[in-house]
Amino acid sequence: MAKKITAVIKLALQAGKANPAPPVGPALGQHGVNIMAFCKEYNARTQDKAGFVIPVEISVFEDRSFTFITKTPPASVLITKAAGIAKGSGDSAKGQAGSINRAQLEEIAKTKLPDLNCNNIESAMKVIAGTARNMGVSVSD
C-alpha cells in the first residue's frame, strides 16, 4: 500500500546552499521532517546549478519520510542572467531594462520546457518572450 501524503511544501532555495535556518527549518520542522537529511540531499542534487534559485516541491508522508522534486529555475532569473541585468524594469511599458536575442530566448525555452505547460519549443519561446516583455526586456532577432 502506498504511503499517505500529509503535506506538500513548496520552497525556492539557492542551489547547493540549503541549511536548517529559515525558511527551510520552520517549514520542514512543523511537519516533523529530518531537516538535515533534506538539506544534504538537496545540496547534493543541486550542486551543479550553483548561482540559481531552484524551486523544490517536498512531499511529506505520514511516517515523516519525504521525497522532493526540483524544478527548473524561474524564467525571470534565467532572463536576467541572459540579459546581464540585476533586475527587470519597474515599469515595463515605459522603460527597457535590457535585451536578449532569439538564440538566448530559445536556450531559456529549452531549459524551462519540462516545467511549462507547452508541448513544443515554439510555444515555450512565446511564453518566455511574454515573461521577458513583462520584465522590460526586449527580444531582438
Curated annotation (Swiss-Prot):
Q: Does the keyword Mitochondrion apply?
A: no
Q: Which GO biological process entries does UniProt record here?
A: translation
Please give the SUPFAM superfamilies that the UniProt record associates with this protein: Ribosomal L11/L12e N-terminal domain (SSF54747), Ribosomal protein L11, C-terminal domain (SSF46906)
**Transmembrane helix among keywords:** no
Report the GO molecular function annotations.
large ribosomal subunit rRNA binding; structural constituent of ribosome
Q: Tell me the superkingdom of the source.
A: Bacteria
PTM comment: the record says: One or more lysine residues are methylated.
Q: Which UniProt keywords apply?
A: Methylation, Ribonucleoprotein, Ribosomal protein, RNA-binding, rRNA-binding
Q: Which Pfam families match?
A: Ribosomal_L11 (PF00298), Ribosomal_L11_N (PF03946)
According to the record, the segments passing through the membrane are: none
- Gene Ontology cellular component? cytosolic large ribosomal subunit
Function of the protein? Forms part of the ribosomal stalk which helps the ribosome interact with GTP-bound translation factors.
Assigned protein family: Belongs to the universal ribosomal protein uL11 family.
Q: How does it assemble?
A: Part of the ribosomal stalk of the 50S ribosomal subunit. Interacts with L10 and the large rRNA to form the base of the stalk. L10 forms an elongated spine to which L12 dimers bind in a sequential fashion forming a multimeric L10(L12)X complex.
What is the protein's given name?
A: Large ribosomal subunit protein uL11
Whose protein is this, by species?
Prochlorococcus marinus (strain SARG / CCMP1375 / SS120)
Gene that specifies this protein: rplK
